[in-house]
């Protein structure tokens, strides 16, 4: 997942980096040539408004996504002081498996089964490294320490079972948020934002070309005047085409239904988690 995110971010930055220097060089060249003799052309208000909305939306997602991506970090709310227990568990499994090599085939059979079961349990525990799972494992250890005869042992046992259910539900919620929100933003919206940056630069370039064409008309000799005017009309058409193309892309990015559904998915998955967790916890009998 981290590799994928790095790849997407790298593509976006590379696209921006390749466009920005060209736009700056073009602007510098034109301003040097024109000076203050030609007033900068104004772009249509509806285009400018859409462009600003896209920039604002990108900034909004850049604020929210890194925080929501926390759900993709293994054990993000897992107590640090409990990780040693999990590490020790892993060492125990590895030790038992390594010791199999010193036994005869007949002796290996039952222990191999134990080692395999322990490895399977360890693998199964990895996706559910949440605070709830840590509470569950701690309560389970407490039950063992107290012994079956202690009247409070069953209470710790119930806590262990219920907290494990909630922890597993949280793991499901986090996976759903990652799939329905984080991956969608990275795979769909970020490439569109990169494309929006490219077409924005293209519009600016076409505008500068039109300004240059108009400057050529002012300084054209009579025999070249019609040619220069034709170049202005061509530049106007290219600018209008670039603006219309950009507006279509901007409107796709700003689609209210798509973005609302995307954001709603965070709340929907949280709501489902809390409802399912409440139902699971209501089974308590202590």
UniProtKB/Swiss-Prot annotation:
Name of one Pfam family that matches? BAR_2
Q: Name one GO cellular component term.
A: cytoplasm
Question: CDD domains per the record?
Answer: BAR_Gvp36
Main location as per UniProt = cytoplasm
Which biological process terms from the Gene Ontology are attached to this UniProt entry? endocytosis; meiotic cell cycle
**Is Cytoplasm given among the entry's keywords?**
yes
Cytoplasm as a keyword of this entry, yes or no, is: yes
Q: Which domain of life is it from?
A: Eukaryota
Q: Which UniProt keywords apply?
A: Cytoplasm, Meiosis
The places in or outside the cell where this protein is found are: Cytoplasm
Role played: Has a role in meiosis.
The name this protein carries in UniProt is: Meiotically up-regulated gene 64 protein
Origin organism is Schizosaccharomyces pombe (strain 972 / ATCC 24843)
């Amino acid at each position: 997942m981290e590799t994928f995110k790095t790849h997407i971010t790298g593509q976006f930055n590379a696209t921006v980096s390749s466009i920005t220097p060209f736009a700056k060089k073009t602007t510098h060249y034109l301003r040097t040539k024109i000076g203050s003799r030609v007033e900068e052309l104004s772009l249509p208000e509806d285009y400018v408004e859409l462009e600003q909305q896209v920039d604002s939306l990108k900034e909004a997602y850049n604020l929210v996504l890194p925080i929501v991506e926390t759900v993709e970090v293994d054990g993000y709310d897992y107590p640090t002081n409990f990780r040693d227990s999990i590490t020790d568990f892993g060492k125990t499994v590895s030790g038992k498996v390594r010791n199999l090599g010193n036994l005869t085939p007949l002796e290996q059979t039952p222990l191999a089964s134990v080692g395999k079961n322990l490895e399977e349990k360890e693998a199964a525990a990895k996706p559910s490294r949440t605070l709830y799972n840590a509470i569950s494992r701690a309560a389970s250890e407490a039950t063992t320490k107290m012994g079956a005869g202690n009247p409070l042992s069953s209470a710790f046992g119930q806590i262990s079972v219920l907290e494990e259910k909630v922890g597993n539900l949280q793991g499901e919620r986090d996976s759903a948020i990652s799939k329905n929100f984080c991956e969608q933003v990275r795979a769909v919206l970020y490439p569109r934002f990169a494309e929006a940056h490219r077409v924005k630069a293209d519009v600016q370039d076409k505008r500068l070309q039109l300004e240059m064409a108009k400057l050529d008309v002012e300084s054209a000799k009579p025999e070249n005047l019609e040619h220069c005017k034709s170049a202005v009309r061509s530049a106007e058409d290219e600018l209008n085409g670039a603006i219309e193309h950009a507006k279509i892309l901007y409107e796709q990015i700003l689609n209210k239904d798509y973005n609302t559904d995307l954001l709603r998915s965070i709340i929907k998955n949280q709501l489902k988690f809390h409802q399912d967790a409440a139902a699971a916890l209501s089974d308590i009998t202590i």
